[in-house]
């Protein structure tokens, strides 16, 4: 949404009534209305039997390519990009470990496509492979070898690999620069190249990527028909599972009726579910998806209370009530805030009951404290706005990295994960704002501020940077673009072994950043979800693959 979780309050003036002080911002209503209120699953036993049989065929296929490492990495890449890698994690991890162990032997290969593909797959899975494997393709003047310049597939592979660069890897910076400049003139004639330039694999959400790549793979003459059939069937089965989940969430939202009762707020529960699908789409994370969708939908409403509707006095009462986390505090709130407050406490109580059943009740307190921390920063930003105070960048970012809600969402994303080993130490780690979380929060905050600047009457990083440096908005945006690129490199570095946490945890942090990158690149596709986001949701949650 427009500065989705960066709160601000209306500017107060003298001799005005409470209602005069409220800002009036017009957001479009839900584009989905009651569309998802009644979705039957429709998954048949025949479909599940077919899926299992085809899955076994793909396992056999993976085993058959054991001795041909080029065929192996091509198959692994296709499996992952088709969105079915989660079925074969054990087999893929085993294969990549073997490839990594023989990396120095196979690194003598002079095919840029193969070298870049191997590098990317290993970096994707956290292996600390060196970037100097590309030195032989770039001369001392920073020019690519002639054989690479004329190799479109190799250039595309190099582009994708160089997006996994880390700080200080100048050769990957140069590779990204060169490959991008050579691919851009070809984008209008190639859907694959155009989509890669718009969203490289490193920033692509699995379900969206699968939807696009299935149609590309279908046209590949070297495609494996069994793998293609499996990917299509799996996509459609998952879609039915997600539709059924969304039906239950849509009914909960309909019962709350906050979209009608709080007309100043954005009604975006379907968009919120789509957001969370980007964090985890696999069937086993259904409880986590349900809780996270409800949390993000409620946070969106709370953000609009601080950003659009609340007066400073009301916001202080609301903040105090949430910090107390006591239903008796509801009596101190105006009617419209009572609706939200009661729903908020009820939502966390529901999840707490679920966690008690799983003997994981301690997790809720971490999530609750992060929500309290979030609204506390909302209140501080509201005070800035009322006093017309513009902080310096350091002061702003210290608060804004929290008010961007990314840290709250990252912690909360772990609460409903069952089956995977998530411990109290993991929650302690993530709530202490580790480097990967701070880097992801920078991406969230700055991308959000750039697309929202000038739309809302609020203080943002753009204002702070312009004032502090006496520069134009264009210069500020340029600087933030550099900082976002640096933050992605920091994410890549934290992803590589040795890691500070398990992949199960780190992938949530990175996936949240990928969602932000999708929704806030160039425009606010959450606040205005009626065009781009609507079409993306249709592709993932409405239309099956034929």
UniProtKB/Swiss-Prot annotation:
User: Any idea which UniProt keywords this protein has?
Assistant: Lyase, Magnesium, Metal-binding
One of this protein's GO BP terms? diterpenoid biosynthetic process
Q: Which Pfam families match?
A: Terpene_synth (PF01397), Terpene_synth_C (PF03936)
Q: Any binding details for the cofactor?
A: Binds 3 Mg(2+) or Mn(2+) ions per subunit.
Q: What class of enzyme is it?
A: lyase
Alphabetized CDD domains for the sequence: Terpene_cyclase_plant_C1 (cd00684)
Which reaction(s) does the protein catalyse, per the Swiss-Prot or TrEMBL entry? (2E,6E)-farnesyl diphosphate = (-)-germacrene D + diphosphate
What are the binding positions for Mg(2+) 3 in this chain? 448, 456
Name the coenzymes or cofactors required.
Answer: Mg(2+); Mn(2+)
Entry-linked InterPro entries: Isoprenoid_synthase_dom_sf (IPR008949), Terpene_cyclase-like_1_C (IPR034741), Terpene_cyclase_plant_C1 (IPR044814), Terpene_synth_N (IPR001906), Terpene_synth_N_sf (IPR036965), Terpene_synthase-like (IPR050148), Terpene_synthase_metal-bd (IPR005630), Terpenoid_cyclase/PrenylTrfase (IPR008930)
Q: Which residues bind Mg(2+) 2?
A: 303, 307
Motif annotated as DDXXD motif, chain positions: 303-307
GO terms (molecular function) for this protein are: germacrene-D synthase activity; magnesium ion binding
Listed binding positions for Mg(2+) 1 are: 303, 307
Q: In which pathway does it act?
A: Secondary metabolite biosynthesis; terpenoid biosynthesis
EC code: 4.2.3.75
Q: Which family does it belong to?
A: Belongs to the terpene synthase family.
Q: Give the protein's function.
A: Sesquiterpene synthase that catalyzes the formation of germacrene D from trans,trans-farnesyl diphosphate (FPP).
Domains as described in the record: The Asp-Asp-Xaa-Xaa-Asp/Glu (DDXXD/E) motif is important for the catalytic activity, presumably through binding to Mg(2+).
Q: What is this protein called?
A: Germacrene-D synthase
**Species for this entry:** Ocimum basilicum (Sweet basil)
Gene encoding it? GDS
